[in-house]
Design a protein with these regions (language model features):
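Tryptophan-rich substrate-binding surfaces of secreted polymer-degrading and adhesive proteins
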Residues: 38-102
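A glycine-rich, hydrophobic loop/mini-helix early in the fold
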Residues: 100-142, 147-149
Length: 262
């Protein structure tokens, strides 16, 4: 065969756009991205075949996951489950389960530096005393994650990034006039850890209407959120979204996916 030639179009270089609390596509499908890079937000539709693991945004803005596949009904459910883990019947046999509460498709905002997609298998070697090299290798675990440094620290975003936080917003008449509107994150006490999908979209340098898309179907934010306040530099903080298995999906597609539009 001839000597290989490097292909510049296969070398990726480009910034990322990060979205939090997103839907997972049906297994074998890909998250749809518009020509401008905007992710599609799937909604319920009538008389459609759905499979376990597929997600939609319901009429209340919460994310529902199909846990029993089939064909959706001719009309949408009157009431959607609005507590994580609550099931909703749809048509003759489809069951949706509330997977995450809104806001859905929250844009993470400005990023600093590198955004890392880590796809890692834990491999253990099998050895034999008769051999100096391992005689086999077996996968025993998996660690997949997306890590990034964020710059925008409004509480609307922090509600998805502080696992034990509770978000609220409103108006407080005790505050000074002109500064009575507020948003806050309260923390302290045992509560369930939010788990949701994370989507990273990066534009190709050679094809401005095509993208590389990385997604983790279900993740939790594992880092301590450290918010430095100083005069000389803007506040930044690092977050890591650690994948967990979505057991409603088939083996081989339970963690996430990366695909490149060609």
């Amino acid at each position: 065969m001839p000597l290989g030639t490097p292909t510049p179009t296969l070398i990726h270089q480009g910034p990322g756009w990060l979205y939090l609390n997103v839907c997972a596509p049906a297994s074998g499908k890909r998250h749809v991205i518009g020509s401008d890079g905007t992710p599609a937000e799937p909604a319920w539709s009538a008389s459609q075949a759905v499979t376990a693991g597929q997600m939609i945004i319901d009429a209340n803005g919460n994310i529902q996951e199909c846990t029993t596949g089939g064909t959706t009904g001719s009309t949408a459910p009157n009431v959607w489950g609005s507590t994580v883990g609550t099931a909703t019947a749809d048509g003759a046999n489809v069951v949706w389960t509330c997977a995450a509460l809104g806001p859905a498709y929250l844009f993470a905002g400005a990023l600093e530096g590198v955004t890392d997609l880590d796809i890692g298998a834990k491999v253990e070697e099998t050895t034999a005393d008769q051999e100096t090299l391992p005689i086999d290798a077996v996968m025993t675990g998996e660690v997949d994650s997306i890590a990034v440094t964020l710059k925008e620290s409004d509480c609307g975003k922090l509600q998805l990034l502080v696992p034990h936080g509770t978000y609220a917003s409103g108006s407080d008449s005790a505050l000074p006039a002109g500064a009575q509107a507020y948003e806050e994150i309260a923390f302290g006490g045992l509560k369930p850890v939010p788990k949701y999908g994370v989507l990273l979209i990066s534009k190709r340098k050679d094809q401005t209407l095509k993208f590389v898309i990385s997604q983790i179907y279900r993740a939790y934010q594992k880092e301590t959120v450290k918010l430095p306040f100083q005069r000389g530099k803007e506040t930044t903080y690092k977050v890591t979204f650690q994948a967990i298995a979505d057991e409603n999906r088939p083996v081989g597609d339970r963690g996430g996916k990366v695909y490149r539009q060609t």
